[in-house]
Swiss-Prot record:
This is Ribosome-recycling factor. Responsible for the release of ribosomes from messenger RNA at the termination of protein biosynthesis. May increase the efficiency of translation by recycling ribosomes from one round of translation to another. The gene is frr. Keywords: Cytoplasm, Protein biosynthesis. It is found in: Cytoplasm. GO terms for cellular component: cytoplasm. One of its GO terms (molecular function) is ribosomal large subunit binding. GO terms for biological process: translational termination. It comes from the Bacteria. Pfam families: RRF. Belongs to the RRF family.
Length: 182
């Protein structure tokens, strides 16, 4: 029973790491990446659709994103959605595609993004710790379990937690390095 609780906690922590990776990919680094547009939702014939599902997004140059909507009629809606997403991007549209030049980030913007990443890191660490707390509470509720077994499982949960917290820290350091590299 306790093994199931441990596996479930580890799975939840892994999902938290995956969510953090997705979040980090969406932070602008001064290099063109289609991932920064992942959360952009476009009004597509009355329903909101992710931009990456109604268009082809490419990065032919390190400082340029090109969006080719599958339907030309959605270009103005897509440009509006990109502006509305408040990503600090300035899309330029023509008849068939949208170009988004990516300006290099200033040092102040880079430092603010690093602060933002560290703030987000704390939120994800709290999620991991909450999973640890919930798992320990579940283990304590198991009937006919000795105090030694509870203690052993608490140690195992802590080791798992430490492993995932270290992964979060490593991902953050990597993103910080990427942000501060000009």
């Amino acid at each position: 029973m306790t093994d199931l609780i441990l596996k479930n906690a580890e799975l939840q922590m892994k999902e938290t790491i995956d969510a953090y990776v997705i979040h980090l990919r969406q932070i602008r680094t001064g290099k063109a990446s289609g991932a920064i547009l992942d959360k952009v939702m476009v009004n597509y014939y009355g329903s909101l659709m992710p931009l990456n599902q109604i268009s082809q997004i490419t990065t032919p140059e390190p400082n340029l994103i090109i969006i080719k909507p599958y339907d030309r009629n959605v270009i103005t809606e897509a440009v509006g959605a990109i502006h509305k997403a408040d990503l600090g991007l300035n899309p330029i549209s023509d008849a068939t595609l949208i170009r988004i030049p990516i300006a290099p980030l200033t040092e102040d913007v880079r430092k603010n993004l690093v602060k933002k990443v560290h703030k987000e890191l704390e939120g994800y660490k709290i999620r991991i710790r909450n999973i640890r707390r919930d798992a320990i509470d579940e283990i304590k509720k198991v009937e006919n379990i000795s105090k030694d077994l509870i203690s052993d499982n608490e140690d195992k949960i802590q080791q798992i937690t430490d492993k995932f917290i270290k992964q979060l820290d490593d991902l953050t350091k990597e993103k910080e390095r990427e942000l501060m590299t000009i």
